[in-house]
Curated annotation (Swiss-Prot):
Part of the 30S ribosomal subunit. Forms a tight heterodimer with protein bS6. GO terms for cellular component: cytosolic small ribosomal subunit. PANTHER family: 30S RIBOSOMAL PROTEIN S18, SMALL RIBOSOMAL SUBUNIT PROTEIN BS18M. The gene is rpsR. It comes from Rhizobium meliloti (strain 1021) (Ensifer meliloti). This is Small ribosomal subunit protein bS18.
Length: 82
């Protein structure tokens, strides 16, 4: 006879896919002058946070990176966080 385990059967856990914060009707525009918005996408070490963590779409991630680099060049954001 086959043994039946007494452990409950678990359903697989599916994490809900995050949506891009820059896509949609009321989404903020990516602008190099908006330092507060850009700082949310920079790590404590001063690196640009990858899109797999922030759930930003590929197109908007490129725009975001370009805006951060432009703000750094103009002196609005630091290159190195001290």
């Amino acid at each position: 006879m086959a043994e039946v385990s007494s452990a409950p059967v678990r359903r697989p856990f599916h994490r809900r896919r995050k949506t891009c914060p820059f896509s949609g009707a009321n989404a903020p525009r990516i602008d190099y002058k908006d330092v507060r918005l850009l700082q949310r996408y920079i790590s404590e070490r001063g690196k640009i946070v990858p899109s797999r963590i922030t759930a930003v779409s590929q197109k908007k991630q490129r725009e975001l990176a370009q805006a951060i680099k432009r703000a750094r060049f103009l002196g609005l954001l630091p290159y190195i966080v001290s």
